[in-house]
């Protein structure tokens, strides 16, 4: 299976809408007011136009997406690059593809192209596994806030992309 990492194009919008809607089912069930959870086609098209929306294709099919924001959502809290709208097609979840896309964006885009040694993202305290997943991937909480929209406590997390420990496998 060939893997391709690339910027999304407008022609990908319907496929991204389908993936994002299905991937964000739990977010809707938790009552979180995240734009990606209830995005329509116009919002997906705007996201592709305004931001840097990346996809992972396997054998020609988009299976995961993540967005490097060019908007101002967190600029008052941090000048660091902010990633959002991370989604993996449910039939491909828990197979490592989301992690591969996140690693690729961190290494090739955030560090490689932008030259930023750190990256940020946000998630909700009440989500049953996202905080822990990001922490296992090296993200650390650095800000806690309540947006007063019913979502409860939100965490802003950041990850240092340089000086990461390298693991050596011994044969």
Roles of regions detected by a PLM:
Residues 2, 80, 131-133:
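Residue-level marker of the N-terminal boundary of ABC ATPase nucleotide-binding domains
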Residues 4, 82-84, 120:
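Conserved Rossmann-like nucleotide-binding pocket used by diverse enzymes
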Residues 4-18:
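A short beta-loop-alpha structural element at the N-terminal edge
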Residues 10, 21-91, 102-104, 108, ...:
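Acetyl-CoA-dependent GNAT
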Residues 11, 15, 62, 128-129:
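Short alpha-helical
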Residues 77, 95-96, 151:
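Non-catalytic, surface-exposed connector residues within folded enzymatic/regulatory domains
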Residues 89-103, 124-132, 136:
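Conserved glycine-rich acetyl-CoA-binding loop
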Residues 115-137, 143-171:
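C-terminal "cap" of GNAT-fold acetyltransferases
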């Amino acid at each position: 299976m060939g893997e391709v990492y690339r910027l999304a194009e407008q022609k990908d919008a319907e496929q991204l809408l389908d993936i994002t809607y299905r991937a964000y089912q739990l977010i809707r069930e938790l009552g979180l007011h995240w734009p990606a959870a209830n995005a329509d086609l116009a919002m997906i098209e705007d996201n592709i136009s305004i931001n840097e929306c990346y996809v992972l294709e396997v054998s020609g099919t988009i299976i995961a997406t993540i967005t490097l924001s060019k908007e101002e959502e967190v600029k008052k809290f941090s000048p660091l690059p902010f990633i959002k709208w991370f989604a993996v097609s449910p039939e491909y979840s828990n197979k490592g593809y989301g992690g591969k896309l996140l690693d690729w964006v961190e290494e090739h885009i955030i560090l490689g192209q932008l030259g930023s040694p750190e990256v940020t993202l946000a998630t909700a305290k009440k989500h049953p596994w996202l905080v822990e997943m990001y922490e296992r991937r090296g993200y650390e909480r650095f800000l806690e806030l309540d947006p007063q929209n019913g979502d409860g406590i939100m965490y802003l997390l950041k990850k240092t992309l340089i000086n990461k420990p390298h693991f050596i496998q011994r044969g």
